[in-house]
From Swiss-Prot:
This is Putative type II restriction enzyme and methyltransferase RM.MjaORFECS2P. GO terms for biological process: DNA restriction-modification system; methylation. GO terms for molecular function: DNA binding; endonuclease activity; N-methyltransferase activity; site-specific DNA-methyltransferase (adenine-specific) activity. Keywords: DNA-binding, Endonuclease, Hydrolase, Methyltransferase, Multifunctional enzyme, Nuclease, Plasmid, Restriction system, S-adenosyl-L-methionine, Transferase. Its EC number is 3.1.21.4, 2.1.1.72. Probably a G subtype restriction enzyme that recognizes an undetermined sequence and cleaves at an undetermined site. Probably also acts as an alpha subtype methylase, presumably on the same sequence. In the C-terminal section; belongs to the N(4)/N(6)-methyltransferase family. It comes from the Archaea. It catalyses: Endonucleolytic cleavage of DNA to give specific double-stranded fragments with terminal 5'-phosphates; a 2'-deoxyadenosine in DNA + S-adenosyl-L-methionine = an N(6)-methyl-2'-deoxyadenosine in DNA + S-adenosyl-L-homocysteine + H(+).
Amino acid sequence: MVVMAQTKLCSDIEIPKEVYNKWKDFIKLVGNIILSIKQIPELEGKFKELLKKGRYNFKSDDFGGQLPEPFTRQKVIEPILEFLGYEFTSEISKKSPLGDRKIPDYRVSVFNKEILIEAEPLGSDLNKKDSGIHQVKEWLIIKSYGVDTGIATNGLEWVLLHYDDTIKEIRTLKELNLKSIFEYVLENKKDKDLENELKQVFSEFYYCFSKEYIEEYIEVATKNIKHKKEEITNEFYKEFVKLVFGFEDVKDVKKKDKSSSEKDKGTKKCLYNCIEAPPNTSELDKKKFAVLLMNRLIFIKFLEDKGIVPRDLLRRTYEDYKKSNVLINYYDAYLKPLFYEVLNTPEDERKENIRTNPYYKDIPYLNGGLFRSNNVPNELSFTIKDNEIIGEVINFLERYKFTLSTSEGSEEVELNPDILGYVYEKLINILAEKGQKGLGAYYTPDEITSYIAKNTIEPIVVERFKEIIKNWKINDINFSTLDEILNEDSKIAENKHILRAFLDELDKIRILDPAVGSGHFLISALKELLQIKKRIYYLLREEMDIYKEKLGIILNNLYGVDIDDIAVEIAKLRLWLALIENLDVEALKRGEVLLPNIEYNVRCGNSLVGWIDENLKQLSISYLCDNVRIMCVLEGLIINAHNSEERKKLKKAKELLEKRDGYVLDNYVEAYHLLYEVYRTSHGLKANLLKELLDEIRDSIYESVTPAYFAEIYQNGNNKKNNGKKSKKNRPRVEEFEKLKPFHWKIDFGWIIKEEGFDVIIGNPPYGNLLSPTEKEIMKRRDTPEFDIFVTFIVHSSKLLKNEGYLGFIIPSSFGTGVRYSNLRKELFTKMCLKKLIYLPFDVFSGAYVDNCIIILHKKPPKSEDLVLIYAFPKKTKKISFEFKNDLFIEYSKILNDPKCRIFPKSPEIYIILDKIKQNCRESLTYLEDLTESTIGILASKYKFSDKKENEYYLPYLEGNVYRYETKLKLKNYVDFSKHKNNEKLINLFMSPEKIFIRRIVNRQDRIMASYGNIEGVVKKDLYVFVLKPDTPINYFYLLGILNSELISYIYIGKSAIALKDDFRQTTLEELRELPIVIPKNKNIINALTQLSKLRFELNDKLNENDRIFLENIIDSLVYGIYFQDLIPKEELNEICNEINGIIKKYDEKSIDCLKYCQNIIKLLNTINTNELVRKIRNKN
């Protein structure tokens, strides 16, 4: 007997050994199925033909009078489904409420989820349109059944499909054919080697498709796909930066300062060093050219995948060049003509040698701006004479497969545009020579960009739909979610007029990413809107033109701004690639479709500095109608307009530019927008003329607006520092101001600002103290926070957001509870309605040492009864799932009731606990700051030290550390405290003979580390010092027991976003001071906790682990009893405390032994351990 070893499926997925034990039963099942087929004589021979050829076109007569599909379902598919463990009932009706849409043959349950199964007749093609795979994909995309997994089968072939809501695409996770197993049984083969091979086929089938394992397989398979992408991305990026810029890896870059990196670039052979640029070219422009060249080459690789350019174009042209005797370099001989004379030139304008070149003659004109010669100054004068380096670049690119579609589990190395976003986001930071930390930029994972896009766009869509329903005066339709609106069973599904109005309304939604980076958020927004449109077209029973709809979304809905022009180019590239994915290549070659001009949707500029709607009092405008060239070009464009609509827009623009009365600037902004609308779908000479026109108009407006805005900020802006007085001190010149790259929203997106702003603003703004001194001064004069750039982005974006609009950012978690953000939270959360705040796991961003959260805001005043979702992922969560239970929502009043409007991570439990304490302990509740004076230790590097006490101001300096109930501090030397000689309060705190120390770091068990100290001296900054105020009704050991208790640690961790940090979880002095301290009136209880706490402290070095746990359990239980007075009756608690006080006569081990046998203590522990609230705190429920 041959024993099958445990094998791996693919991508290191191991199949459980138990699966192989089912082989014999499956063979028996297959035999029974074949017997049922043999019972129909006319079918048997044709079934053998099917197994031989793999496909056979059966007719109805072949099934002995039965229809092919019902026979296949009853005799083949259903027995196999039963074997796979599914319970099912066949659907009676094959029509949906829409009348002509199929519904699934089976809907089977897998635990709490459903899987759709579409059955097709034996021998049928599962890839045929409107059946099989196509049908399952349609169901998954439209979400009619609320499921994300489906199976298509014809009995022999089985295909597992899974919808990934993050990328809004369907993955084929497994395709498997049972033909060889049926053939093996039918022919009664006895080949052991063949049997072992077929056992492997069966094991894969059972593991991937059975009820027992399908969920496990889907989870592992999707995880492996993600892991494989990450590996490919990292490999590609490492090679990329080495080849293009000479850096070995990212860590190498981060270690180098500017001078050393420039030195390396001069010695290492890389693309950057081989670029020959025209005289006076800046280093930045040279870098931009290197990136632009790589953009173009990668873009061409994607064009190869789409069939727009010949396969292996770069490799073949390079090989031909090496064989030829061409005197000029490869870049000038092949790449320059390809970029500028082919891809950027319409076919009828190309030179004869280009039209007849075998490589270029069939390549269509693309348009779109990527291949224009004005992306870098003097771009046509750049060259690369080193052919070898270009060959290395081409060989590097040829090692990868570039695909515009999502990988479906192929083992081949593939790169798609989403992966390139990751590569380029890291590249942007290197090019800026600040590193990621300097720019505060990191690539945001798909699941986060998708979640933010979905949860900001969908609410707007729902609100817009409500307006449509209201306009149609339909009152009997109730809905609150998009799924309810787009459900096949809803009344809306039957009304095509409303659905078309809905489509039109979607085109009006304006979405902005003000820190666009590589365009990742815009791509997620594109996918979200496209998904909604797919569902509407499904209800309309119409085929959607995906290219047309993507084009409309990119031109009408999506806008971005970034201060880095390289980032802007990459963002545009990604949008073009998303569009090309669905491009009709034949239509492109016929000249019927072209790439749009999108450079005016995604702009370069400083999002934080520029005119929005301020009243510019010193504006002096130049009349554009005096510019003869502009007027002449416009006249020519009007004469040669493509159609009447275009002519109408051009005429209107000319009229607006000719006006000298009224508010001239508004007229110019409107004219600018009209010309852009014509430009974005223009090409060739007309596109070039329009672009020149647009740039000239924009430059002219900027020349007027920038000085006026500058004057408004520095003369009329708020200046609290000088009590509102005008001051020229530290005021920059307007030329310096222009270097900030001001972006005037009222000009570039004036038509949107005129409509009150953007509907949705999303993104991952940079974080940190990154604003320049000039920028900080501007923010101060605009009453905008400037201490962290992400805060500035939030405030500024709220001004750009339309009323009722949504804002979704990923920002540092410290915003949720940090003291420095208190004023901003109060202002934001009272003017805007917080919808969601989600604390993310550690290490969401590769290489980023900051914890993050997602914030979703709705620009409307909140109501007390509004609900807010607050959730904190466990910090080491590897797989993020954004499926939240309803009980995680809290009422808005709980946020507003907190004086600092903090968002406590452990919600809603922490709010429940704090409310319970306030209600139960009104008279006995106080706070740590009311009972103590406190301070933080010193930063040693800022002080002088001596081995002896030089004078009265040299205080003892203590070295060591503090743990729970353990103080390991000793005198090291003396610290010069003379700078604080007038701060008697601070000196007294450090020199107090008694105190409590608390470590700044929270331990790995999420417990505060506090201990008692009867030692005088100054301590380091890692320790906090607390000294009881005079006449405080408690003692140090009672307070120590409270601070070290399980409950207080839970409250602290639950309230503090800073304490959630995974690497070094921290406390802050401000947050510690707010800890609730309950002081019972019953002295007996105070004495009992004091005795227990002192016993734990005194015996620290003598206790074994079990005794330590036992003693701390009693302390924790007693604290629960003190804080939750309904847990234990007062009399019973008093009796327990009496016994404790009676038992602890001495602080020795005997006291602990006596406590163990005390029945009341055992009862106390049992009561606390079984309490539901306590179990939640301990995560045991």
